[in-house]
């Protein structure tokens, strides 16, 4: 039910054996693999903010994505994209200096750089900088999280998992109108090229199946994204 997987690279979760096993599984099922670098915080699952300099963000991103890239190369696969995790995502959204350091590392690792970030991507410092550096920025939509009135993600998930009936309605609305409803029932316009769901959700498999069925019913074909070349922040 998925085309692409974000893989933790050892800092907030994961380890060498898990990375190798997961890459093999992804290859077996034809799933593209992207790096999911985070902060060096296993106990906090990378969700606690840390004070890092731009050079530390650059080095940490290079280290994690480089490790996964090597595992992929050993299995005749390529790194598909990079997507920051947890508190690192929030830090890059707020800081242009950290965002530039992250983007610089991505360019040096990826032959055709793509970063995945929550829509609307113009809300984030790192995505604005990355686009200007020629990185393909992929806006993502979420159905296991809620949105505020300006399209920001509310980073809290229901313990019981996503409401599947509500997911069907939200997906249908987005496909028809290009809008999602905020927690206050305000319509928010969105542009997205990918739909993200969290694999640790209690009903993640059912959620993936629900989304896939909805997309298939609307005649969408699911496949890993192909990078869109950019020049000075614009599609080539």
Predicted regions and their residues:
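Glycine-rich tight-turn/loop motif centered on a GG-T
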Residues: 5-12, 43-58, 92-93, 151-163, ...
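Acidic (Asp/Glu)-rich catalytic clusters
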Residues: 22-34, 73-76, 107
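Catalytic beta/alpha-barrel core
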Residues: 7-12, 91-92, 110-121
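Conserved, mostly hydrophobic/aromatic
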Residues: 36, 82, 197
